[in-house]
């Protein structure tokens, strides 16, 4: 996989496509038959479903394929970390900026984390403190937010 490949932040991967991508990331290169072997029983999917999902991921340029004999080999240039980061940041882009800190806190509270994970989080918090602002301002469109910080007139 190439480092620092850029995925379009607006590129949405469905939950089903995510399952397929996890198989690709775990194995670098896969055939549709291999993906089906891994997922058909777990997800109760048919081979046709797998092929549809692979084609969607190809259309989104998340996957690429090459032909060897009569088989297609699927792979990706994107790491799981890059796609997960894109997904999470995309989710935070959909909520009021004033609520992001609270949501990050909820994620931490509700996640199983190791001491090493917590050390990484604490280091990130210490680094972020150097550039933190006194107050995060709402940047929502008027009528989309009910935070007290928005300054928007509510009807």
What are these model-derived regions, one by one?
Residues 51-55:
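Short, hydrophobic-biased segments on the C-terminal half of alpha helices
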Residues 30-38:
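Short acidic, hydrophobic short linear motifs in intrinsically disordered regions
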Residues 37-45:
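Short helix-coil junctions and helix-kink-helix linkers
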Residues 61:
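Glycine-centered, phosphate/nucleic-acid-interacting loop/turn motifs that mediate DNA/RNA or nucleotide
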Residues 13, 25-31:
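Short capping segments at the starts of secondary-structure elements
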Residues 109-155:
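C-terminal regulatory/oligomerization modules of transcriptional regulators
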Residues 79-105:
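Conserved segment of winged-helix/HTH DNA-binding domains
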Residues 11-16, 68-87:
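Short, cationic-aromatic polyanion-contact patches
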């Amino acid at each position: 996989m190439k480092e620092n490949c850029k995925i379009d932040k607006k590129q949405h991967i469905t939950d089903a496509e995510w399952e397929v991508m996890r198989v690709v990331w775990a194995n670098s290169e896969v055939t549709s038959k291999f993906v089906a072997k891994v997922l058909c029983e777990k997800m109760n999917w048919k081979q046709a479903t797998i092929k549809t999902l692979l084609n969607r991921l190809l259309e989104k340029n998340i996957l690429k394929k090459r032909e060897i004999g009569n088989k297609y080999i699927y792979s990706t240039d994107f790491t799981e970390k890059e796609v997960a980061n894109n997904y999470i940041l995309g989710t935070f882009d959909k909520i009021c900026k004033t609520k992001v800190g609270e949501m990050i806190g909820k994620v931490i509270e509700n996640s199983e984390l190791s001491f090493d994970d917590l050390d990484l989080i604490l280091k990130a918090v210490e680094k972020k403190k150097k550039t933190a602002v006194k107050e995060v301002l709402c940047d929502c469109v008027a009528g989309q937010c009910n935070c007290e910080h928005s300054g928007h007139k509510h009807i």
